[in-house]
Amino acid sequence: MIDSAKETDRPKHRKRDEVIAFLILAVVIWPILSVAIVGGYGFLVWMSQIIFGPPGPMH
């Protein structure tokens, strides 16, 4: 009897864990990752312009 009660709780507990994992990914990880990627690209462009000069025709 006790084993069957634990088995019925597992799907609810597993679903709750999946919802928590989704919220952590959606609210914390993806925003941080997207800001890091865009910031990294901006830094790369900025450093390349410092080294090679601004874009445009050579005068």
UniProtKB/Swiss-Prot annotation:
Keywords: Cell inner membrane, Cell membrane, Membrane, Transmembrane, Transmembrane helix
A Pfam family the protein falls into: NapE
InterPro entries on file: NapE_TorE (IPR010649), Nitrate_reductase_NapE (IPR004448)
Location of the protein in the cell: Cell inner membrane
GO CC term, one of those recorded: plasma membrane
Annotated transmembrane regions: 19-43
Keyword Transmembrane helix: yes
Coiled coil region boundaries: none
Keyword ATP-binding on entry: no
Function: May be involved in mediating interactions between NapC and a quinol oxidase.
Protein name: Protein NapE
Gene behind the chain: napE
